[in-house]
Amino acid sequence: MLHIADKTFDSHLIMGTGGATSQALLEESLVASGTQLTTVAMRRHQATTSSGESIFAMLRRLEIALLPNTAGCRTARDAVLTAQLAREALDTNWVKVEVIADEHTLLPDTVELLDACELLVHDGFTVLAYTSDDPITASRLEDCGVAAVMPLGSPIGTGLGILNPHNIELICSRASVPVILDAGVGTASDATLAMELGCDGVLLASAINRAQNPVAMAESMFHAVEAGRLAAQAGRIPQRQHAVASSSFEGLASWAEQVL
């Protein structure tokens, strides 16, 4: 179970809608992923599509909870305004907060992010904060009262995987709120590693929506997240510099004994 604030989800995979080539394909991918929570960027959402059904109506039909986000915002003020508009339009106080430093790297502006999160928490929002892989920033976000910390594995859309696994593991070991890896996942093994490092969940969009076969990739991500979660619970063996035999050498017949 993934527990965030006052909600519980069976799936540890959160899927984003960005980059999908069609709503029909997006729907197939959402179902294949098993996700129960999905993000929608308010700034680029279209109320309806050529099919006539809005993405919000589709999510309600699929019984998938909606997580509006503030993608594209560059200041705390813009992020707060976007969150407030989303709450008014969608009747939800949940929001994924993104405040981007520039359009080239899409890395978080952590100063503006902290300001936005503090204001939104004070305004009654349940805040999930997209942030860098810096453990200090993660701790400060937790101090602000966010419901979940969402460090990046690598820059958005790069598919580079987890560039700093030590920091992700450190954030997980210190956090008392859920840690959800967000951004940079390229394939299933990246999602598995995130869970093995101690993350409570994985959020991804491009890895599925821009894959050659999005539905197949969505299914692989479903299994990858579960595999990583089970591996983390099972506990890996210690890493060693030298070989350790799995079977004892005692009782082995030797050539010398046969000759004698």
Swiss-Prot record:
Superkingdom of this protein's organism: Bacteria
Gene3D superfamilies the UniProt entry points to: Aldolase class I (3.20.20.70)
Cited SUPFAM superfamilies: ThiG-like (SSF110399)
Active site: residue positions: K96 (schiff-base intermediate with dxp)
GO cellular component, one term: cytoplasm
UniProtKB keywords: Cytoplasm, Schiff base, Thiamine biosynthesis, Transferase
InterPro entries: Aldolase_TIM, Thiazole_synthase_ThiG, ThiG
EC number in record: 2.8.1.10
Residues involved in 1-deoxy-D-xylulose 5-phosphate binding: G157, A183, G184, A205, S206
The protein's annotated pathway: Cofactor biosynthesis; thiamine diphosphate biosynthesis
The reaction(s) this protein catalyses: [ThiS sulfur-carrier protein]-C-terminal-Gly-aminoethanethioate + 2-iminoacetate + 1-deoxy-D-xylulose 5-phosphate = [ThiS sulfur-carrier protein]-C-terminal Gly-Gly + 2-[(2R,5Z)-2-carboxy-4-methylthiazol-5(2H)-ylidene]ethyl phosphate + 2 H2O + H(+)
A molecular function GO annotation: thiazole synthase activity
GO annotation, biological process: thiamine diphosphate biosynthetic process
Subcellular localization: Cytoplasm
Subunit (UniProt): Homotetramer. Forms heterodimers with either ThiH or ThiS.
Protein purpose: Catalyzes the rearrangement of 1-deoxy-D-xylulose 5-phosphate (DXP) to produce the thiazole phosphate moiety of thiamine. Sulfur is provided by the thiocarboxylate moiety of the carrier protein ThiS. In vitro, sulfur can be provided by H(2)S.
Protein name: Thiazole synthase
Organism: Corynebacterium glutamicum (strain ATCC 13032 / DSM 20300 / JCM 1318 / BCRC 11384 / CCUG 27702 / LMG 3730 / NBRC 12168 / NCIMB 10025 / NRRL B-2784 / 534)
